[in-house]
Amino acid sequence: MRIPLDSPFSPGSDTVPTVWAGRTSQLSDWRDVLRPRRLAGIHERGRTILGEAGSGKSSLVRRIAREASEAGGWATSQLRIPSGADPIKRVASALLELAAAADLPAAREQQIGDLLRRVEAVAASGISLSMRAQEGPEPYTALTDLLIEIGREALRHRDVMVVLHIDEVQNITDERARSQLLIALGDALTHDEIITAPGGARVGRALPIAVYLTGLPEFADMAGAKAGATFARRFKTTTLDAIDDDDLMTALQLFITEGWPVANDAGGVDRVFMEPDAQRAIVDLARGEPFLFQLAGERAWYAGTENLITADQVRTGWKDAALEAETHVQRILDRLPPREHQFIEAMAELAPEERSLTNIAQKLGYAKTTDAGPTAQRLDLSRRIIQRGRPYRFQHRAVEAYLTSNWPR
């Protein structure tokens, strides 16, 4: 039998769900590009992964950090930056924890001991420390220096990656703090460590350090407004799309073919299966959204105790989840600036084949079609809510369903 304790679905914020769906290109980027290249001493930019609420950006990077730790690497916890908090203090504290994990030889090397004390001062005072008149380098440079030392220690261990994950970066609204943090991290990523190669030649190499920033789409504008090309050169930005239905179906396929293993009271293992119709029903309700996929799966699991999840149980469970799903989509719409919100609503009122920029602009009452162009561009490139083309279409299928049908009811 199945009980809530055994549910493999996790709709909770920032968890790494056991039933994993999609995001293969981002995982491949870590496994096949970023990690091997940094371990080989080849420079790779940091990664910025943005997306609307529920797109799974934080869960994705938490999974990457977990993989790094399981491979023997040193990874920070998820460093969430609350609104109004000092990111310099938060990152300084995390780097001190990494230094302890790396067992930096502070006791026998005065330089490292002095560096740790510098970072401790930053962890205590944060951005305010750099606002005081003082001699010497800016205090935030201590973060760069300590991250470089941790990277050097990882290099000595071989095949050890250092991973930092800074979350909710859109909350770093103080331009000075944001600039200092991005420069501190970027300088460590671009640092050339001089080593002696076979044959005696002195060459520079990158340290095995990876930095992931996650947050809402507006961070791209916030970082680019002041840092501009410097930020782009040091961080590669990806905005997450909805997950393809095929990937969601694949994630549930084990329930169909082999059953999901759960422990039984006798100390053995039972299997929980799923009807193909139930599989399709969960995918249809999710509309490509990781959060909604986990929510639909969880409620279907809770809707019965038998070892078979049925389509009726999916529908029964969803009745309790519909309000939460509606609130989730409404929250995304409420965050949009008025001009973008109006564009989305006008587009939704048109038949799918009539969704052209000209028709949308006319519906909005614009004098010229080009007046709607910048808004369409932002909704496509920055938010991934629509996709421009002939005709325009919705990429965020939950938003489309909410505005054009009785979903999620």
Label the model's feature ranges.
Residues 1-45, 196-199, 204, 409:
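A short, basic N-terminal segment
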Residues 42-179, 207-209, 370:
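P-loop NTPase nucleotide-binding core
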Residues 157-158, 163, 171-227:
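Sensor-1/coupling segment of RecA-like P-loop NTPase cores
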Residues 240-278, 285, 296:
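Conserved small helical "lid"/interfacial subdomain of P-loop NTPases
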Residues 284, 288, 294-369:
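Winged-helix-like regulatory helical subdomains adjacent to P-loop NTPase cores
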Residues 364-382, 389:
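Short amphipathic alpha-helical interaction segments
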